[in-house]
C-alpha cells in the first residue's frame, strides 16, 4: 500500500466516496442543445442515430448516446434504448416508420442513464430486455437516483423509469432475430461494472457500447486497469468496424481502440507517477492527462473526474 492508514492524498473526494460509487461522471448536467437527429443505415438492416457530444438538457431529452435497431427476418432488436422515456419513444416511432415486425429484444448495455432510460418506451412490445448479470444490482444502487436527476432536468413525464434485464448475460449469449444472430459478451469491470457488448454475425459489426468512446472523452466508472484489459478483449474479437457508444455511427475498430487505450494508458501511468511522488489529488486533477486535452470533446468536464477515479483505484495497488 502506498498510503498510511488514516491518511489520504485525495481528501477532496471524500464526499464522492459517501455516495458508494454513484456515477457522478455520467449524470446529466446542463449543456448545449442536441443537434438534429436522424437514423442512418450503417449496414444491411442496421440503423443508428448519432448522439451529439453534449450533456443532457431539457431540449435534447438526454438523447446523447448512439442508439438504433437491427432488423431480422422475424423481429427487431433495439441496440440501445436511449437516454429517457422521450428518447425511447422517439426511437420506437422511427422503428415503426420502417418496419411492422415485432420488437423482440431491447439491449441495456450498462447502467448509465443515457443508455438505458429509454427502455420503458418499449413496455407495450413486451420485449426481452438483455443486460449484464451485474446490471440489476447496479440499477438497484443507482436507478432511482438517476431517475430523480433526469426528472429534475427533463420533467418526470419525459424522464422514464428503471427497467431491469429479463435476460441476464453471465458470460455469453445469442439471440436469433430470424436469419440474424446477435452474440453478446459480458465484460469485467471497465467503463462500469456491468458492460455488455454485442456483435452482429451477419455483418461482423461490433457494438461495444461505452467500452468504446470516439471523439468524446471516455468516462471512468468501473476499473481503469480492467478497461485496458477489456479493450484488448475487444481487439481479439477480430471485428473491423464498430458502432461506439459515443462518436461517429460507424468507425474502424483498430484506430478507435488505439485512441482509447492511449488515453487510458496515459491516465494510468501519470496517475501512478503522481501517487508515487506524493502529489495531492488536488494538483493531480490539474496535471494528469493534460497532453490529451486537444484530442477529446468535453475534456475539461470529465478528465478531472477520471483522475479522481483512477486515484481511488491505483492508490492501494
Name what the model sees in each region.
Residues 79-81, 105-110, 130-132, 207-209, ...:
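Active-site neighborhood of phospho(di)ester-bond hydrolases with catalytic His/Asp-centered motifs
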Residues 276-317:
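C-terminal regulatory/interaction regions
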Residues 16, 29-50:
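C-terminal segment of N-terminal export signals and the immediately downstream linker at the start
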Residues 2-25:
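N-terminal secretory signal peptides and thylakoid transit peptides that target proteins
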Residues 93-168, 174, 193, 269:
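Active-site HxH/HxHxD metal-binding segment of metal-dependent hydrolases
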Residues 228-279, 287:
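Divalent-metal (often Zn2+) His-rich catalytic cores of metallo-beta-lactamase-fold enzymes
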Residues 41-94, 196-208:
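Conserved beta-strand hairpin/beta-sheet module of binuclear metal-dependent hydrolase folds
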Residues 168-200:
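Core dinuclear metal-dependent hydrolase active-site scaffold
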Amino acid at each position: 500500500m502506498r498510503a498510511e492508514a488514516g491518511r489520504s492524498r485525495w481528501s477532496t473526494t471524500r464526499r464522492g466516496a459517501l455516495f458508494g460509487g454513484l456515477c457522478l461522471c455520467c449524470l446529466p448536467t446542463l449543456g448545449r442543445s442536441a443537434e438534429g437527429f436522424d437514423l442512418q443505415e450503417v449496414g444491411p438492416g442496421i440503423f443508428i442515430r448519432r448522439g451529439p457530444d453534449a450533456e443532457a438538457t431539457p431540449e435534447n431529452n438526454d438523447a446523447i448516446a448512439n442508439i438504433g435497431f437491427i432488423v431480422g427476418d422475424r423481429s427487431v432488436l433495439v441496440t440501445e434504448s436511449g437516454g429517457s422515456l422521450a428518447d425511447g419513444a422517439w426511437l420506437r416511432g422511427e422503428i415503426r416508420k420502417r418496419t411492422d415486425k415485432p420488437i423482440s429484444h431491447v439491449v441495456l448495455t450498462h447502467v448509465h442513464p443515457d443508455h438505458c432510460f429509454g427502455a420503458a418506451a418499449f413496455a407495450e412490445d413486451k420485449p426481452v430486455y438483455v443486460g449484464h448479470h451485474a446490471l440489476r444490482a447496479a440499477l438497484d444502487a443507482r436507478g432511482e437516483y438517476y431517475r430523480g436527476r433526469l426528472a429534475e432536468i427533463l420533467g418526470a413525464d419525459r424522464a422514464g423509469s428503471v427497467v431491469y434485464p429479463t435476460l441476464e448475460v453471465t458470460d455469453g449469449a445469442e439471440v436469433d432475430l430470424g436469419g440474424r444472430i446477435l452474440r453478446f459478451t459480458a465484460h469485467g469491470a471497465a467503463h462500469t461494472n456491468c458492460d455488455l457488448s454485442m456483435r452482429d454475425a451477419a455483418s461482423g459489426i461490433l457494438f461495444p457500447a461505452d467500452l468504446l468512446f470516439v471523439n468524446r472523452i471516455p468516462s471512468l466508472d468501473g476499473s481503469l486497469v480492467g478497461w485496458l484489459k477489456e479493450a484488448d478483449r475487444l481487439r481479439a474479437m477480430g471485428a473491423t468496424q464498430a458502432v461506439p457508444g459515443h462518436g461517429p455511427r460507424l468507425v474502424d475498430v483498430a484506430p478507435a481502440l488505439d485512441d482509447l487505450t492511449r488515453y487510458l494508458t496515459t491516465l494510468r501511468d501519470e496517475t501512478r507517477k503522481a501517487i508515487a511522488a506524493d502529489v495531492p489529488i488536488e494538483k493531480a486533477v490539474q496535471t494528469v492527462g493534460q497532453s490529451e486535452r486537444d484530442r477529446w470533446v468535453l475534456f475539461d468536464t470529465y478528465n478531472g473526474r477520471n483522475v479522481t477515479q483512477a486515484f481511488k483505484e491505483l492508490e492501494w495497488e
